[in-house]
Amino acid sequence: ADYYYDYTCMETLQGLSASELSSVDGRKWRTTYSDPDNTKREGLDSTVWPKAFERMEQFIQDTGLSQDDLDMNYDDIVEMYQSNKLAMYFGSSAGVKMFQDQGINTTFLPFFQENGEKWIMTTPYFQVALNSNLTKDETRRKKAMKVLDTMLSADAQNRIVYDGQDLLSYSQDVDLQLTEYLKDVKPVIEENHMY
């Protein structure tokens, strides 16, 4: 993976421990951690995170991850994959298409968990923050909600999708077809094992 970028370490940590982070304890921790009304500083708990870091440590040992790996960017990783120096890389369905178009046999795999579950990382995610002052001005709140409704609409989401790039929608009223590049993880998506 392109560990040069700080988000890759977090995505790897989360991907390796998606089942724990999606458990009752994991959801409870995430809810408390991200609650804007929580005035108590919330750190890593002693239930979910020790296992997550143990798994990350095992991953580092198993893969032989070194300081040199931490300095590689996305282009370095792509070049190594194209020249058969890497067996796997962390990417998207668009990457699968790109490599298949180059004649490289590539498939999309989920993160395999110790409990037998399979999960896929859904990044980048769509996150929105609305200013609490909107509750004081109904006209502005309605305008903000109209923008949000438009962004979450089926039309807007279908415009995002382009040849070989998938979009997994959390909106139940949006029907998006997966490209052939995610066919191998369709059961994982149908089980809603997306983190």
Locate predicted features.
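Extracytoplasmic/periplasmic solute-binding protein
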Residues: 1-41
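Paired acidic/hydrophobic, glycine-rich loop segments that form the ligand-binding mouth/hinge
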Residues: 87-92, 107
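Short helix-initiation/N-cap motifs at beta->coil->alpha
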Residues: 67-82
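Extracytoplasmic/periplasmic substrate-recognition and gating elements
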Residues: 100-168
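Glycine-centered hinge/linker elements that transmit conformational signals in sensory
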Residues: 27-70
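Beta->alpha turn/N-cap motifs
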Residues: 74, 90-96, 124-126
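Hydrophobic residues within well-ordered alpha-helices
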Residues: 10-13, 79-84
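Long, aromatic- and glycine/proline-rich binding clefts that accommodate carbohydrate-like moieties
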Residues: 109, 161-195
